[in-house]
Amino acid sequence: MFVKLFCSLVTESEFVLDFITSNRKQGLSKAPRINMACDRMQWGAEPWQYADLYMPDDESPYQKGGNIPCVMLIHGGFWKEQYTSELMRPIAEDLAEAGIAAWNIEFKRWKEGDEGVWMDTLSDVMRAWGQLALLPNIDVQRSMIMGHSAGGHLALLLAAKAERKPWLAIAQAPIADLIAADQSKLS
């Protein structure tokens, strides 16, 4: 599904097209794997302010000047506490296997009784995007964001508000109309 979405949204990028083509031939659903190694990095003082960095094991075919592109992944789950960045781990692993770094972030989520959390959530996502620029061997000019559901909403907000714009922003099934989502009792 991820590869098909990438294919329908992006047609100009050589490295994205290569990624799509190679994964179509191989299929994303290989034998079940043991969790790929990643580096967990705390980027803030709160326990939820961390990201897992997945880097290719081998030299990336997308390397330019020693740096590779990175996709910052923002998970969905209606901003609720029980949904974590673990939802995006398979995509992070697939990207790293294809030669693209993945920065799978966590952010503040709400639990029953919380109010006004979404502004903290947006702050977390903006801060994580800033931290991505400090990572070694990352090509910031070709770095992207991708979010699903609530993460898609956050990806759209980040793309609109960030001073350093992502090369590409992908919002998978974003919650783009918060009023309609609330009226429909989606969360």
Placement of each model-derived feature along the sequence:
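Short phosphate-binding/catalytic loops that engage adenosine nucleotides
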Residues: 100
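Primarily recognizes the serine-hydrolase "nucleophile elbow" in alpha/beta-hydrolase
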Residues: 127-186
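Short, surface-exposed "cap/lid" segments of acyl-processing enzymes
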Residues: 59-66, 71-94
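Catalytic nucleophile-loop/oxyanion-hole region of alpha/beta-hydrolase
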Residues: 82-91, 103-141
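Catalytic metal-binding/acid-base residues of hydrolase active sites
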Residues: 78, 108, 175
